[in-house]
């Protein structure tokens, strides 16, 4: 018996998911294309009203605009869109934050649209179309003649990110075994994707070439998708049993094992294909599934605010820009190992604890950062002990936020029946994208008062922790196929016969 029953087909699925995450890192591209270089004045005799380190970016812009005739753009580690389109100060600086917001609006729209398409037309074709669109428009964004055109193209790229995180994620998850889910998120994860994404941006050094190169990272997925079958679980929900059997045979061949038809399949009758179009309304067709949608969706919202708020603000912190980004990505990747080890050796470490423990540590980290920022700063050097402490604590906090994401994705994937799984994950993702809309504005507000993002993150994090402690379901080890055989909801006279393999309750 192989480790976690992993075969060569599962390995292929793992790598496909990693390439999908390479493209999903478009959501942190604002860290790079929105990078604001330092500003100073070359006028003789010009001095700021107080030491520059004690001025916010908005105050620096105000003094330069009022008293300086010859601005100096300081050397930057990455040539951003801000430099090309002169979006340093005033309303133009706010417009640069809006570009990221528009990108997140695209992800919000994509979550709503692709979730429904994935459940109706199938995981494979919708994933192929969504990823293809993302690559094409991502490459095109590198040639944008204005920031307005760039924003429109990023809106479309945002929809494709949603397709990957919802439909493609469900597609991959329906191919692998329950015991492999944590393995997937441990060794093929956002941290490694972020490392590669940051490396590409470092090599390119310019937002246009980086936009093209990072979009092409997902290209290897497309030819493999053409070769792979549709998800048998999706076929089963549509009562397309013959096609399901053919898909299973191909998967067996790809896995290098003999196809063995399940005993309960031999007596299945050919039924009429399920032509019902499921919508978001089906998530509220019964109390158990509505309960799950509300609870899990609220956690996605809060985690998104915390995650993207901290991520997009990381470019505003002192210290070496690329070193901070590389260390942050590596810390995220390595922190995922703890999930796998806990899941493997401590079976009682369930989905609830996977969310709550990192959440508590994250709140502690950002409360500490908030206190450090509010306290008087006697050291103007970016290498000072105070700024170094903020960077280190921020990296730790960001790593633990990513662990709460794992809990959110695992619970969402394990709680919804196949026929509405991508709608369920899509709805959760929709709520997450609404939360993410706040992130660019939080990063902009940090230019006015640096502690603001951390005040928001800590406040929302505490509410999220309380919801998790009292209401989060535990879904560890759930058989996705069993969710279809024993659905979470029944309507009409059968409501009293509701059956669920998921225990809804507190720790």
Curated annotation (Swiss-Prot):
GO terms for molecular function: transmembrane transporter activity. The chain crosses the membrane at residues 11-31, 97-117, 125-145, 149-169, 187-207, 209-229, 283-303, 326-346, 354-374, 388-408, 423-443, 452-472. Pfam families: Sugar_tr. Keywords: Membrane, Transmembrane, Transmembrane helix, Transport. It is a multi-pass membrane protein. InterPro entries: MFS_dom, MFS_sugar_transport-like, MFS_trans_sf. Its main location: membrane. The keyword Transmembrane helix applies. The keyword Transmembrane helix applies. It is found in: Membrane. GO terms for cellular component: membrane. It comes from the Eukaryota. Belongs to the major facilitator superfamily. This is Uncharacterized protein F23F12.3. It comes from Caenorhabditis elegans. The lineage of its organism: Eukaryota, Metazoa, Ecdysozoa, Nematoda, Chromadorea.
């Amino acid at each position: 018996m192989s480790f976690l029953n992993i075969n060569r087909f599962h390995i292929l699925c793992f790598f496909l998911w990693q390439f999908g995450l390479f493209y999903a890192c478009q959501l942190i591209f604002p860290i790079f294309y929105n990078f604001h270089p330092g500003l100073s004045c070359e006028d003789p005799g010009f001095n700021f009203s107080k030491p520059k380190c004690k001025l916010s970016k908005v105050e620096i812009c105000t003094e330069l605009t009022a008293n300086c005739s010859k601005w100096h753009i300081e050397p930057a580690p990455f040539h951003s869109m801000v430099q090309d389109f002169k979006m340093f100060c005033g309303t133009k600086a706010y417009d640069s934050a809006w570009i990221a917001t528009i990108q997140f609006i695209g992800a919000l729209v994509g979550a709503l649209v692709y979730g429904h398409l994935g459940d109706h037309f199938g995981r494979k074709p919708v994933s192929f179309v969504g990823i293809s669109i993302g690559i094409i428009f991502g490459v095109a964004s590198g040639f944008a003649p204005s920031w307005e055109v760039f924003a429109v193209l990023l809106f479309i790229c945002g929809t494709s990110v949603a397709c990957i995180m919802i439909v493609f994620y469900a597609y991959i998850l329906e191919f692998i075994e329950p015991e492999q889910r944590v393995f997937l998120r441990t060794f093929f994860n956002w941290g490694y994707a972020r490392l590669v994404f940051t490396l590409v941006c470092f090599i390119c050094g310019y937002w246009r070439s980086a936009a093209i190169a990072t979009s092409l990272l997902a290209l290897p997925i497309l030819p493999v998708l053409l070769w792979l079958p549709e998800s048998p679980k999706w076929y089963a929900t549509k009562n397309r049993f013959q096609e399901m059997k053919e898909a299973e045979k191909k998967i067996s061949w790809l896995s290098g094992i003999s196809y063995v038809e399940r005993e309960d399949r031999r007596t299945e009758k050919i039924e009429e294909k399920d032509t019902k179009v499921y919508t978001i309304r089906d998530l509220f067709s019964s109390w158990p599934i509505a309960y799950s949608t509300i609870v899990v969706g609220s956690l996605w919202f809060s985690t998104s605010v915390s995650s993207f708020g901290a991520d997009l603000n990381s470019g505003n912190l002192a210290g070496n820009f690329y070193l901070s980004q590389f260390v942050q990505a590596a810390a995220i990747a390595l922190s995922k190992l703890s999930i796998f080890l806990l899941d493997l050796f401590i079976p009682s470490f369930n989905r609830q604890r996977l969310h709550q423990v990192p959440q508590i540590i994250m709140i502690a980290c950002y409360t500490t950062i908030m206190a450090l920022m509010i306290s008087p700063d006697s050291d103007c050097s970016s290498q000072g002990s105070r700024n170094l402490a903020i960077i280190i604590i921020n990296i730790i906090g960001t790593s633990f936020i990513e662990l709460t994401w794992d809990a959110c994705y695992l619970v969402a994937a394990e709680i919804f029946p196949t026929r509405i799984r991508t709608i369920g994950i899509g709805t959760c993702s929709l709520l997450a994208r609404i939360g993410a809309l706040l992130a660019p504005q939080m990063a902009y507000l940090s230019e006015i008062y640096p502690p603001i993002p951390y005040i928001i993150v800590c406040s929302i994090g505490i509410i999220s922790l309380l919801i998790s402690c009292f209401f989060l379901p535990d879904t560890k080890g759930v058989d996705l196929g069993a969710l279809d055989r024993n659905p979470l909801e029944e309507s009409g006279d059968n409501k009293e016969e509701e059956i669920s393999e998921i225990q809804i309750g507190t720790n």
